[in-house]
């Protein structure tokens, strides 16, 4: 399993510069996962979901207790996909920017 690491600061989502996002090959299934590292208190105790986008389609996945999830196979078929996060706590809803992930099509 390969893990792609992301950083969350408030409403900003970025790729972790210490993580290798190179040589990701489209068509992978059940292999890629995403892990999110949170800075700040905004996200504490929120229920969190990652949304993965391919063109205009969205695929949402709840994060596990390690703030990770499997990346849906549906977005792993093109030369890129995007990801964002949503958090919900009581009446508060928080969303992040999108991060783009490139893939090699072979």
Give the residues covered by each predicted segment.
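N-terminal assembly/attachment segments of tailed bacteriophage virion structural proteins
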Residues: 1-106
